[in-house]
């Protein structure tokens, strides 16, 4: 027996809804998205707004504290220590269509007869088709977001500023969140940077990272939570650090240590934070060869509390089922997200690159 258009729409929507909320099939093609995972782990939804997501930024103590004698006149001032940083929010969409002819070629019949019930074979065949399409839409959505959110936002009039703008290789120029980084007095709004680091001398790269780490922790004592790197930077640091492995010791209840429990962790670490390789940085280098700062030679020291993904409430990776239009025998499924991305404390982050 065939499917009705409503049955097909319901099956498509429910399948996508289930797929998005559960682990996908084992994937052999798509690359990892550690940057997107970082953003999603600390995302902060917003209620909606006309055009911008606004953050309150404390920029100065505007202090007038001074010594005074027994009957000296003292002063008071009207402190102006808050500014607002405004970041654009926008929308992304990914969708697929299935024509009734395409479905029929796969043994699935669609009819307007409301009394029909699909056969077991049709259910299995439709499930196979939907699984493939839903995996593509979900993975495509993630790949698009991970890639685009590394860029500076100039790639499209609808794009939001990404990491290349928020943690910039030229932090003394440009406007971020409506605050001009080039203006005297706005130094607080600049991230740290060290590019063109020579790796010819052993220990030089590690020393540069030590200095940048210290800069990141200067204001408020907040340490970077994540270090994302391209493959060339990772290889350079691995050689410079001579494959150093951090070791963790677990304290037992009796106060003794037990090296046998989680005695060591694999990977390459700096200050206890693992250097995470971002494949998309290598992909960006392949897509934009000859960039002023090679993408695969970069290292980002980030603070996930201060680098924010702000989806509109209930609008992150939403499965959609647009109705079939009257003059097309085509059925649609989609996924949309509405969000912005901002930064609230650039001076806790740094971008480095090797020569």
What are these model-predicted stretches?
Residues 2-355:
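Flexible, glycine/threonine- and acidic-rich loop/arm segments that mediate assembly and lattice contacts
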């Amino acid at each position: 027996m065939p499917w009705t258009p409503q049955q097909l729409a319901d099956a498509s929507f429910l399948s996508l809804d289930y797929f998005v909320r559960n682990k996908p099939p084992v994937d052999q093609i798509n690359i990892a998205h550690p940057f997107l995972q970082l953003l999603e782990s600390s995302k902060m939804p917003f209620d909606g707004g006309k055009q911008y997501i606004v953050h309150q930024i404390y920029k100065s103590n505007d202090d007038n504290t001074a010594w005074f004698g027994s009957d000296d006149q003292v002063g008071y001032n009207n402190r102006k220590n808050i500014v607002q940083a405004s970041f654009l929010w926008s929308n992304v969409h990914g969708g697929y269509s299935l024509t009734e002819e395409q479905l029929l070629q796969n043994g699935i019949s669609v009819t307007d007869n409301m009394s029909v019930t699909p056969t077991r074979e049709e259910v299995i065949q439709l499930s196979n088709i939907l699984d493939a399409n839903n995996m593509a839409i979900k993975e495509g959505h993630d790949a698009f977001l991970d890639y685009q959110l590394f860029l500076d936002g100039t790639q499209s009039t609808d794009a939001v500023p990404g990491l290349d703008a928020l943690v910039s290789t030229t932090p003394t120029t440009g406007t971020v969140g409506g605050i001009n980084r080039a203006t005297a007095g706005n130094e607080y709004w600049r991230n740290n940077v060290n590019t063109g680091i020579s790796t010819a001398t052993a220990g030089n790269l590690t020393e540069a990272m030590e200095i940048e780490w210290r800069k990141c922790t200067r204001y408020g004592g907040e340490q970077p939570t994540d270090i994302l790197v391209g493959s060339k930077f990772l290889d350079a640091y691995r050689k410079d650090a001579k494959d150093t492995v951090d070791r963790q010791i677990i304290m037992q209840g009796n106060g003794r240590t037990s090296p046998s429990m989680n005695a060591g962790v694999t990977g390459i670490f700096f200050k206890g934070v693992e250097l995470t390789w971002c494949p998309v940085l290598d992909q960006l280098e392949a897509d934009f060869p000859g960039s002023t700062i090679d993408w695969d030679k970069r290292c980002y020291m980030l603070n996930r509390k201060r680098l924010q993904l702000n989806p509109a409430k209930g609008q992150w990776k939403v499965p959609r089922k647009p109705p079939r239009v009257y003059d097309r025998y085509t059925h649609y499924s989609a996924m949309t997200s509405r969000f912005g991305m901002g930064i609230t404390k650039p001076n806790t982050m740094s971008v480095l690159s090797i020569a």
